[in-house]
Design a protein with these regions (language model features):
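An intracellular "coupling" helix at the cytosolic face of ABC transporter transmembrane type-1 domains
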Residues: 15-20, 110, 127-136, 140, ...
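Hydrophobic alpha-helical segments in the permease module
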Residues: 64-79, 249, 281-306
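Juxtamembrane helix-loop junctions of ABC transporter transmembrane domains
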Residues: 4, 40, 44, 71-114, ...
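Cytosolic ends of transmembrane helices, especially the final helix of ABC transmembrane type-1 domains
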Residues: 219, 243-246, 295-324
Length: 368
């Protein structure tokens, strides 16, 4: 079994190719929505500036309002398209993984002493494969958005107001840095939770199959107590993972709120002439655009933080699969189609056939 977590990350990377075009749609649709978001915020700020500062009548503002509504509808459509495509890609990848694992199980000899128990193998194929679902459907699109959109938004804002641009570019990296620190502890807790889930699933399945034997030997109460103990261990490990997730999300929200509050404070103090850091007056149009974009710069990072533990869950699931069934095949082995032979039947004659048990202690057929 591979002990290095980097190998698990490489395997997740290789599995992406099985997502097909749907995965590309899931990755690119949110980026297109981010580009439209800038256009929408700029148009909304322009409409507000014209209405408040310019005093233009509502009839002249209706084209801008219509454009804003149209952009909202298109962005909602792109969001739904990306989400559905992510689910389709994840299902395709899980199907490929299960085919590969079934192939590995069929290739194993029934006499293999190292083979996993049937309950553990079933848990690996069902539960642990399911653990990669949200990695491809949610985490990967969120990671791409977090890597690109804040930088693009910051680059757009920087020429308009260098103070706001610098504030964004300084505060935004604090969130990924903290996520990396939290991720170390989260990965360990998630690995333990995956092992506890696999142990409980395998134990319950095996005991269920041997229920009659357990009752005959009067062991049903002892095994029930053992399953209760395993369930309690899983509950504690799951709560540990959830506590780390909630704590990290709270701290990340704190950093994001500080960034948004800093922009709001800067814009407000500039408007009332308490700050004079700009070379030119701050217009209402630009000020509203900065306020509208402030939460949007942190949204991709917050989205990544909310799905960051899906990455740890996927890695833990792959490690558990490897521990129970061995290294995952990159591609399932395609079994050739077996067509019935045409023509006359073939006869086979065996003389003096002897058949013994594998330990050669008993003779089943002698000299037939």
């Amino acid at each position: 079994m591979t002990q290095n977590k980097q190998e698990t990350g490489k395997l997740l990377g290789r599995l992406r190719i099985h997502g097909g075009p749907a995965l590309w749609v899931a990755l690119l649709a949110p980026l297109a929505g981010g580009a439209l978001l800038v256009w929408q915020a700029w148009t909304l700020a322009e409409v507000l500036g014209q209405a408040i500062e310019g005093g233009q009548p509502s009839a002249l503002l209706m084209p801008g309002v219509g454009l804003i509504l149209g952009l909202l509808v298109v962005r909602a459509g792109l969001g739904a398209l990306g989400e559905q495509a992510g689910l389709i890609a994840a299902e395709a990848i899980k199907r490929q993984m299960r085919q590969a694992l079934f192939t590995r199980l069929l290739d194993r000899s029934p006499r293999d002493a190292n083979a996993a128990a049937s309950g553990l193998a079933a848990a690996a194929i069902v539960d642990q494969v399911e653990a990669v679902d949200l990695y491809f459907a949610r985490y990967l699109p969120a990671a791409l958005q977090a890597a690109l959109l804040p930088l693009v938004f910051g680059a757009i804002i920087l020429p308009l107001d260098w103070v706001a641009g610098v504030l964004f570019l300084v505060t935004a990296p604090l969130i990924p840095i903290f996520m990396a620190l939290v991720g170390w502890g989260a990965q360990i807790a998630t690995d333990r939770q995956a092992r506890a889930l696999s142990h409980l699933s395998g134990r319950f399945s095996d005991r269920l199959k041997g229920l009659l034997t357990l009752k005959l030997f009067g062991r049903e109460e002892a095994e029930t107590a053992g399953i209760v103990e395993a369930s309690e261990a899983l509950r504690k490990r799951t709560l540990k993972v959830l506590s780390i997730a909630f704590l990290s999300s709270a701290v990340l929200e704190f950093f994001a709120a500080l960034g948004v509050a800093g922009i709001a404070l800067y814009v407000g103090l500039t408007f009332i002439d308490y700050l004079h850091l700009r070379g030119s007056p701050l217009t209402l149009h630009v000020g509203m655009f900065l306020l509208l974009m402030a939460p949007e710069i942190y949204n991709p990072l917050r989205l990544l933080a909310s799905h960051y533990h899906d990455r740890a869950t996927a890695k833990a699931g792959l490690l558990e699969i490897e521990r129970q069934l061995g290294a995952l095949l990159d591609k399932p082995v395609e079994l050739a189609d077996i067509a019935p032979r045409s023509g006359p039947a073939i006869g086979v004659t065996l003389n003096t056939l002897t058949l013994r048990t594998p330990d050669r202690m008993r003779t089943i057929l002698d000299g037939a």
